[in-house]
Amino acid sequence: MRMFRITACLPSPSKIRTQRELQNTFFTKLVPYDAWFREQQRIQKLGGKIIKVELATGRPNTNTGLL
């Protein structure tokens, strides 16, 4: 199965409401090839930024730090 390994940064939702210090959350995730556009839109709607995209093979919901 073709998958993308994406690394993205999202602002923390709890800090946005109080308008204090913004704290960013970085994460790495495996996304299926067919769902890439939907995931990209979701990250951008939340005000996040996509840092890195790589082609990967593997199973969804696995820790990509160990690959």
From Swiss-Prot:
Name by which UniProt lists this protein: Phycobilisome 7.8 kDa linker polypeptide, allophycocyanin-associated, core
Name of the encoding gene: apcC
GO-annotated biological processes: photosynthesis
Localization (cell): Cellular thylakoid membrane
GO cellular component: phycobilisome; plasma membrane-derived thylakoid membrane
Domain CpcD-like: from-to ranges: 1-56
UniProt similarity note: Belongs to the phycobilisome linker protein family.
Membrane topology recorded in Swiss-Prot or TrEMBL: Peripheral membrane protein
Main location (coarse class): membrane
SUPFAM superfamilies listed in its UniProt record: Allophycocyanin linker chain (domain)
Native source organism of the sequence: Synechococcus sp. (strain ATCC 27144 / PCC 6301 / SAUG 1402/1) (Anacystis nidulans)
Keyword terms of this UniProt record: Antenna complex, Membrane, Photosynthesis, Phycobilisome, Thylakoid
Function: Rod linker protein, associated with allophycocyanin. Linker polypeptides determine the state of aggregation and the location of the disk-shaped phycobiliprotein units within the phycobilisome and modulate their spectroscopic properties in order to mediate a directed and optimal energy transfer.
Annotated PROSITE patterns: CPCD_LIKE
